[in-house]
């Protein structure tokens, strides 16, 4: 493309301070260096992780910064050594990477790349420790290696999944983070047998995706557990068959679920990050074969306490990261699940706004309205 090797000036939504509305700025985006790609973002969406680090209540603030990590775009140019993707390829940026060289990437079991796994404290490129974004010569920090709230962004090639160009980017962009995380937690990690009973703790976007995964796997009962009963009706669209609101019961949730399921559920997936919900999700699975999967990220000081007999009685506890999907290897297959109509993505998308109104997406999330809001970069 004519812009290859040159600095590109474009619009980006910049966070200058914690919790303050993003402002539209003209930024300069440097060309990609070795093993990097520059991508024209067409659609992006807002994830809770963006909001968490934008609020910067529980971690070191890093501003000014360009947030965003759920997106779809087209490769504009590539740096030296890049062979996997070329200009014009349709891609999904991913907050965690796959270098394909480290022990994790070579393992059939792990997706936790040594080089490119998520690092929320790094605001620069891994290659040279510099930012590719600037305003008037002043660097602007990156976010989780993606920074998709910009018309153009630069990423390590290991954080870019090349997908079917026929796939609509305004739909499949949501597969680059939360939806795949929940889906994979069910189909790759919990692996519910056909006809089994699954409990999903937390019915936000990730929990609904976990329910969708359980539905795809053939679970016959999918029990949604949430303190917000308003979410229940919507969750039926994602396969939930019944619901438990802990506020409606005097017994512990794990006992309520055991009573409903003749001793415990076959699988549970915990998507809240609340350590008490994690304990409940583990203790509600059936002895002998029950498997609980933890997806939600707990508070840094949280402690998980349960009696060792719960393990000795043959309950299994697993953790997962990005649904155990390897980004470059597996995400193209998730997109194909959508293309084959095995996975419904449209029902996750409840709102859409032009890029100039990106702060509306933050307002919707703050109010708990909707599931995913698509941000259209072309307005």
Curated annotation (Swiss-Prot):
Zn(2+) 2 binds at residues 99, 102, 105, 113. It catalyses: a primary alcohol + NAD(+) = an aldehyde + NADH + H(+); a secondary alcohol + NAD(+) = a ketone + NADH + H(+). GO terms for biological process: formaldehyde catabolic process. InterPro entries: ADH-like_C (IPR013149), ADH-like_N (IPR013154), ADH_Zn_CS (IPR002328), GroES-like_sf (IPR011032), NAD(P)-bd_dom_sf (IPR036291). An alcohol binds at residues 49, 69. Coiled coil: none annotated. Its cofactor is Zn(2+). Homodimer. This is Alcohol dehydrogenase 1. The lineage of its organism: Eukaryota, Viridiplantae, Streptophyta, Embryophyta, Tracheophyta.
């Amino acid at each position: 493309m004519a812009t290859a090797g040159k600095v590109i000036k474009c619009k980006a939504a910049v966070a200058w301070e914690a919790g303050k509305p993003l402002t539209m700025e003209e930024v300069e985006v440097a060309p990609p260096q070795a093993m990097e790609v520059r991508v024209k973002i067409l659609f992006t969406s807002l994830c809770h992780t963006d909001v968490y680090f934008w609020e910067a209540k529980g971690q070191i603030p890093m501003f000014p910064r360009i947030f965003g990590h759920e997106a779809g775009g087209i490769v504009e140019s590539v740096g030296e050594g890049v062979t996997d993707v070329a200009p014009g390829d349709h891609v999904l940026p991913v907050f965690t990477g796959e270098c394909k060289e480290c022990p994790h990437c070579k393992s059939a079991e792990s997706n936790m790349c040594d080089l490119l796994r998520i690092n929320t404290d790094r605001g620069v490129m891994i290659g040279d420790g510099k930012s590719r974004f600037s305003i008037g010569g002043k660097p602007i920090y990156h976010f989780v290696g993606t920074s998709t709230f910009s018309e153009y962004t630069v990423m390590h090639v290991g954080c870019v999944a090349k997908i079917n160009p026929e796939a609509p980017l305004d739909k499949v962009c949501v597969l680059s983070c939360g939806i795949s995380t929940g889906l994979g937690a069910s189909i790759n990690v919990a692996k519910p047998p056909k006809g089994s009973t699954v409990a999903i703790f937390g019915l936000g976007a990730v929990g609904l995706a976990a329910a969708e995964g359980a539905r795809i796997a053939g679970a016959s009962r999918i029990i949604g557990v949430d303190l917000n009963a308003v979410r229940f009706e919507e969750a039926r669209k994602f396969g939930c068959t019944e619901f438990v609101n802990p506020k409606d019961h005097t017994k512990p949730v794990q006992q309520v679920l055991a009573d409903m399921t003749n001793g415990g559920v076959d699988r549970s997936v915990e998507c809240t990050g609340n350590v008490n919900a994690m304990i409940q999700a583990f203790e509600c699975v059936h002895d002998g074969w029950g498997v609980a999967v933890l997806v939600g990220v707990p508070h840094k000081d949280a402690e998980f306490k349960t009696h060792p007999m719960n393990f000795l009685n043959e309950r299994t506890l697993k953790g997962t990261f990005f649904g155990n999907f390897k980004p470059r290897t597996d995400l193209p297959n998730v997109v194909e699940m959508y293309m084959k109509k095995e996975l419904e993505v449209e029902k996750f998308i409840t709102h859409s706004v032009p890029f100039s109104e990106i702060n509306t997406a933050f307002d919707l999330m703050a109010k708990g309205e909707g599931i995913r809001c698509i941000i259209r970069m072309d307005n």
